[in-house]
Every structure is written in structure tokens, then in C-alpha cells.
Amino acid sequence: MKLFSFNKLSLMFLIILFNFTSSEEKLNQIEIATLGAGCFWCVEAVFERIDGVIDVVSGYTGGKTKNPSYKEVISGKTGHVETAQISFDKTKISYDQILEIFWLSHDPTTLNRQGNDVGTQYRSAIFFHNLNQKNIAERSLKEKSNSKIFKNRIVTTIEKLDIFYEAENYHQDYFNNNPNAPYCQYIILPKLKKLNLIQN
């Protein structure tokens, strides 16, 4: 009976340890990228359709104002950028590949604007989480600048991530929740079609 109890406890311990280890391994597979490429509704809609991306959260970072509201950010006075924080499985997609999509999905040569969205809150920016991301971002920027893919000079900034403030709930999954909204129909949808992320 004692032997049985010991074996049962050992088995339970091994199961708990296995589950903990599996969860820890899964967490180690997840990396986060924080990018500014114009309106965060667009950035979110693009990356939500990329294989290997687990979650995308719209928010604000890069400024000094604490807990900014959308109204404050779009005033252009907070210094914050509309950004998307992208959680991805690095066994399926790399940070390098995330940046490739970033370059393709917006115009990194227009200073403080994307299309009709104008202001410092729409600036092109890569916010790195660690030294490895910083090095990859700098190399990627250099490669794109040297490749002359873009006619004009790239103005994307590479900045250390400080505090990321999650945007209000109504901004999250905006395209999915408001597919018929004018901005979605005339701005986001054409972008998704151009990138072959949605069927015509």
C-alpha cells in the first residue's frame, strides 16, 4: 500500500513537472515585436493574418504621457506612436520575417505620415525589446536602405521600448469587428488585398 502511494505520488509529480516544462517551453517559443507603421488598425489587420502570429494588440508607446488616451495621442502632443504589439511563435516565423512584412506593409520613407494619416503618432518606428532585436532591426534597415527598393530615404526610427500602453477596447481587432466601416473598406481592405492576405 505504501509502495502504491509512493508510485502514485511520483506519477502525479511527473505529470505536474511535464506540464510545467511543456508550458515553459511554449513560453520560450514566444517573442514579441512592437512596431509603428501608421494607423494601428492597419498594422493589426496585416499581422493578424500572418501564419505564426499568436496575438496582436494595438497600443501606444514612444512618448512621455502616462496612460494616454486615443484622443490625447492623435493630438500629436504626447510623443506616442500608434503601435501594434505582435506576439509570435519564433519556431514558425522569425523576427527578421516579421520585419520583412513591416517593410512591405507601409511606406517607411514618409516622415510622420502614412497616406492621409498625418502626425508624429503615425511615424514609422521599430521598438526593440532586447539587444538581439536591436541588432536585427539595424541590419534590416541597412539592407533595405542599400537595396534601393524605396525611391526615397527610409525615415524609420529604431527605439528602445519603454512602456507599451494598450489602446482602448474598441480599437482591438478593429478591422475584424468593423469590416464595413469606411476606413476599413477604403484603406485597410485594399492593403490586405495588395499583400495577398485576403481574397478578392
Predicted feature residues:
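Bacterial N-terminal signal peptides
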Residues: 8-19
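Flexible coil/turn and secondary-structure edge motifs
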Residues: 3-6, 20-200
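N-terminal leader/targeting segments
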Residues: 2-3, 14
